[in-house]
Amino acid sequence: MSDLFAPDGGWRVRILDLSGGAQNNIVEEIGGFETLMQANAFARRYVRDSVELCRVPGTTAKEVLEAWFAFGEDAEVIDAGEAGWRSATELGDFVDNPAGSEDRDWRALDPRRIDEDDEDE
C-alpha cells in the first residue's frame, strides 16, 4: 500500500490490551493518520511507551518482556499489510534498551490531539 492511497478517513491504529481485559483485546482504534508513515511512527512510539511503563528499576530485559506481555499494550496499523509496523520486529531491542522521552512521545503524533490544537488557533 502507498501513502498516496490512504483509506477513507486516514490510516487507523488499533490498540490491543495484552492483559486480556478488553473484548477481543481491543482497547480502541485511533483514526485520522494522513500517511502510513505517521501511523507506523505512532504505533511504534505507543508500544515503546507501554514497554517503558512495564520497566521497573532493577528488572532484567526478560522480566520487562514478561511484564509487557502480561500488562502492556500493543499497537497495529489496520489494513497496512506488510508495510505496517509490527512490535515483534523491535520488541527485543525495546526491552534491552530503555527509551528516551522522544521515543515514547506518541501523543505528539496523535491525530486527536492535532485536531484539538487546530481548534485552539
Positions of PLM-derived features:
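Classical N-terminal secretory signal peptides
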Residues: 1-2, 121
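Short aromatic-glycine-(Arg/Gly/Cys) micro-motifs in beta-strand/loop hairpins
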Residues: 2-29
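A short, exposed loop/beta-hairpin motif centered on an aromatic-Gly-Thr core
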Residues: 24-41
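Compact, well-ordered interaction domains used in eukaryotic information-processing assemblies
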Residues: 32, 46-49
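Glycine-rich loops and low-complexity Gly/Arg-rich segments
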Residues: 37-42, 54-58
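Short, mixed-charge low-complexity intrinsically disordered segments
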Residues: 48-121
